[in-house]
C-alpha cells in the first residue's frame, strides 16, 4: 500500500525539521562548541579571555579591532630600541602578557592555543601530518601556492621534485648570477654619490629590485626578460593587496572587495599564468627533443619532474602538472624575493645603528676577499657575517608566526587538544623570550651565535626563522647565500649609517618589512 501525503503537509514537515535543526546548529556552532573548547582548555591550566556570545553577531570584530590597532601603531615610529611585537603582533602579545605563556585566544569561534615550549614546538614541526597548516582566507589565494600550501602525499611529491633545485652544488653554480646582480646595484649607488663621496638613499626599493633580479636570473636564466615581466606582475598584485589592507576594510567584509580590484587581480593572475605557461612549454619541448636544459631553477625543476615521470613509465599523473609547475615558479619569486630583501634591509638598518659590528664584519670580509669577487669557499669562512645574519633573523624573522589546524583530537606534550583547535607558534615572541635567550633577548647581540645555532639555543627548538623539521623552508640556503654575497659586496664598497630621516615602523604586510623604507647614508670607501 502506498501512502500519499499532500504537498502542503510535506512542506510543513520539512519546515518543522529545518526550524528544529537550524537553531540547534547555530546554538552548537556559536555557543555550545566554543564553550566546550574553553572548558577543556582551562581544565588543563590554559588561560584566555572567556568566549562571549557576541561572536555570533561580530565574528570578526576583535580581529578587525586588532588590525586597526596595528595599523595605528604602524603610523608611528616605535624607536629602534623598542620591541616591535606589541605593535605588530598585539593579539598574541597582549594575551601572553595578560595570561602567561600557557594561554589561548579566540579567532572567531575557534580557540588558538599559543605554544612557546621548545619541546612542544619540536613536536608540532615533527608531526607534519597531525599538524597541517591553517587554510588561508580567500583573498590570500593569490599569494598561497606551490609546495607551501600542500599537505600529505602531495606535499611529499612536490618536495621530492623541487628539492634538487636547491642542492648545494646547484647553488654554487648560481654564484655568478648573484654577484652580477649585486654589482649592478652597487654601481647604481656609486652613481648617486655626491662630490664628497656620500649620498642618502632609501635602500629598501633597491634591495627589492636586487632580489627580484637575482630570482629572474637564477630561476629563468635565458628567459630572464620574461622572468622580469612576471615579477612586475606579481609586484602589482602584491601592491593591490597591501593597498586594500591600508583602506581599513574589516576582515569580515573582504569578500565584498570592490569589483575593480578583484577584476584586476584576476587579470594579473591570468597574465602571470600565460607567461609562465609559455616559458615552461618551450623548455619542455626542448627537453623532449634531447636539448641540454639550462642549469637554472626552472631547468632543474623540469629535469627532476621529467625524471619522476620516467621512473613511473612516463605517467604524467605522477609528476607535476603544468599548473603546479607554474605555482612553484610563482613561489620562487614571491618567497625568494621577499625573504632575502627583508633580511638584507634589516641587516643594513642594524649595522647602520651598530657601527662596531659593521666594522668587524668589514674587516672579516676584506681579510677573506680583499676587493675581489666572492667564491663559495670564502663565503663559508665568514663567521662574523653569519653571526650577524642569524641575529637579524632572530629579531626580524620573515614571518612572525606559524598556525597549524587540528583535524582530529591530539595529544601535544601534556595537552589534550580537540579537533578544530588552532595551534599558534609565535616566532617573534619565542625568538625574544627572556627565559630562553636571557635578559638581553631583545637586544642586537650577534655574539650569541659565536658557536652556532645549536649552542645558542642549547639544543632546543627556539630559533626557526625558516621553520623547522621536515617542512623547513627549502630555499633557506639560497636566501642566506644571496644575503652573504650582497652584504659582502656592500661592505667592500661602502660604510654606512642610519639617516636622521629614518623612521622605524616595522609592518607585516605581506612580510616583516619597514613600512616607510630605510633611509641610509652611504660613504664610499
UniProtKB/Swiss-Prot annotation:
It is found in: Membrane. Mainly expressed in leaves and seed pods and, to a lower extent, in flowers and stems. GO terms for cellular component: membrane. The keyword Transmembrane applies. One of its GO terms (biological process) is cholesterol metabolic process. InterPro entries: Cyt_P450 (IPR001128), Cyt_P450_CS (IPR017972), Cyt_P450_E_grp-I (IPR002401), Cyt_P450_sf (IPR036396), Cytochrome_P450_Monooxygen (IPR050665). The chain crosses the membrane at residues 2-22. Pathway: Steroid metabolism; cholesterol metabolism. It is an enzyme of class 1 (oxidoreductase). The keyword Isomerase does not apply. Heme binds at residue 473. GO terms for molecular function: heme binding; iron ion binding; monooxygenase activity; oxidoreductase activity, acting on paired donors, with incorporation or reduction of molecular oxygen. Its EC number is 1.14.14.-. CDD domains: CYP72 (cd20642). It comes from the Eukaryota. Keywords: Cholesterol metabolism, Heme, Iron, Lipid biosynthesis, Lipid metabolism, Membrane, Metal-binding, Monooxygenase, Oxidoreductase, Steroid biosynthesis, Steroid metabolism, Sterol metabolism, Transmembrane, Transmembrane helix. It is a single-pass membrane protein. PANTHER family: 11-OXO-BETA-AMYRIN 30-OXIDASE, CYTOCHROME P450 FAMILY MEMBER. Belongs to the cytochrome P450 family. Involved in the biosynthesis of spiroketal steroid and saponin natural products from cholesterol such as diosgenin and analogs (e.g. furostanol and spirostanol), plant defense compounds used as main precursors for the industrial production of steroid hormones. During the 5,6-spiroketalization of cholesterol, may catalyze the 27-monohydroxylation of furostanol-type steroid to an intermediate product that undergoes a stereospecific formation of the terminal heterocycle to yield diosgenin. This is Cytochrome P450 CYP72A613. It comes from Trigonella foenum-graecum.
Amino acid at each position: 500500500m502506498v501512502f500519499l501525503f499532500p504537498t502542503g503537509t510535506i512542506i510543513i514537515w520539512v519546515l518543522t525539521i529545518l526550524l528544529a535543526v537550524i537553531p540547534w546548529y547555530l546554538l552548537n556552532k556559536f555557543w555550545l562548541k566554543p564553550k566546550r573548547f574553553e572548558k577543556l582548555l582551562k581544565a588543563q591550566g590554559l588561560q584566555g579571555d572567556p568566549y562571549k556570545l557576541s561572536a555570533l553577531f561580530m565574528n570578526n570584530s576583535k580581529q578587525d579591532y586588532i588590525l586597526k590597532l596595528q595599523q595605528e601603531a604602524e603610523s608611528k615610529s616605535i624607536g629602534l630600541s623598542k620591541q616591535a611585537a606589541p605593535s605588530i603582533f598585539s593579539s598574541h602579545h597582549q594575551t601572553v602578557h595578560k595570561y602567561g605563556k600557557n594561554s589561548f585566544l579566540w579567532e572567531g569561534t575557534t580557540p588558538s592555543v599559543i605554544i612557546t615550549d621548545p619541546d612542544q614546538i619540536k613536536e608540532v614541526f615533527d608531526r607534519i601530518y597531525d599538524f597541517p597548516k591553517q587554510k588561508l582566507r580567500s583573498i590570500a589565494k593569490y599569494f598561497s601556492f606551490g609546495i607551501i600550501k600542500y599537505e600529505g602525499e602531495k606535499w611529499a611529491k612536490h618536495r621530492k621534485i623541487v628539492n634538487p633545485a636547491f642542492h648545494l652544488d646547484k647553488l654554487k653554480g648560481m654564484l655568478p648570477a648573484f654577484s652580477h646582480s649585486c654589482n649592478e646595484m652597487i654601481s647604481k649607488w656609486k652613481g648617486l654619490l655626491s662630490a664628497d663621496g656620500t649620498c642618502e638613499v632609501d635602500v629598501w626599493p633597491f634591495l627589492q629590485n636586487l632580489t627580484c633580479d637575482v630570482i629572474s636570473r637564477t630561476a629563468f636564466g635565458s628567459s630572464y626578460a620574461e622572468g622580469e615581466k612576471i615579477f612586475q606582475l606579481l609586484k602589482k598584485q602584491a601592491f593591490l593587496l597591501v593597498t586594500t589592507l591600508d583602506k581599513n576594510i574589516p576582515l569580515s567584509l573582504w569578500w565584498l572587495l570592490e569589483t575593480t580590484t578583484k577584476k584586476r587581480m584576476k587579470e594579473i593572475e591570468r597574465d602571470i599564468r600565460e607567461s609562465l605557461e609559455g616559458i615552461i612549454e618551450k623548455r619542455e619541448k626542448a627537453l623532449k627533443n634531447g636539448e641540454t636544459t639550462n642549469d637554472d631553477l626552472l631547468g632543474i625543476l623540469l629535469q627532476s619532474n621529467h625524471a619522476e615521470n620516467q621512473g613511473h613509465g612516463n605517467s604524467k599523473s605522477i609528476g607535476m602538472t603544468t599548473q603546479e609547475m607554474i605555482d612553484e615558479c610563482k613561489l620562487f619569486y614571491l618567497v625568494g624575493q621577499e625573504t632575502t630583501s627583508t633580511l638584507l634591509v634589516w641587516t643594513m638598518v642594524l649595522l647602520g645603528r651598530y657601527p662596531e659590528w659593521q666594522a668587524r664584519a668589514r674587516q672579516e670580509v676584506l681579510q677573506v676577499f680583499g676587493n675581489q669577487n666572492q667564491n663559495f669557499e670564502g663565503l663559508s669562512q665568514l663567521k662574523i657575517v653569519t653571526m650577524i645574519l642569524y641575529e637579524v633573523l632572530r629579531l626580524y624573522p620573515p614571518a612572525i608566526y606559524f598556525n597549524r589546524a587540528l583535524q582530529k583530537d591530539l595529544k601535544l606534550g601534556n595537552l589534550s587538544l580537540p579537533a578544530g583547535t588552532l595551534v599558534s607558534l609565535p616566532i617573534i615572541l619565542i625568538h625574544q623570550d627572556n627565559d630562553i635567550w636571557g635578559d638581553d633577548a631583545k637586544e642586537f647581540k650577534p655574539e650569541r651565535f659565536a658557536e652556532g645555532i645549536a649552542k645558542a639555543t642549547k639544543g632546543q627548538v627556539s630559533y626557526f626563522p625558516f621553520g623547522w623539521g621536515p617542512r623547513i623552508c627549502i630555499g633557506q640556503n639560497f636566501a642566506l647565500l644571496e644575503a652573504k654575497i650582497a652584504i659582502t659586496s656592500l661592505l667592500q664598497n661602502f660604510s654606512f649609517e642610519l639617516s636622521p630621516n629614518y623612521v622605524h615602523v616595522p609592518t607585516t604586510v605581506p612580510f616583516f618589512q619597514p613600512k616607510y623604507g630605510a633611509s641610509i647614508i652611504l660613504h664610499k670607501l
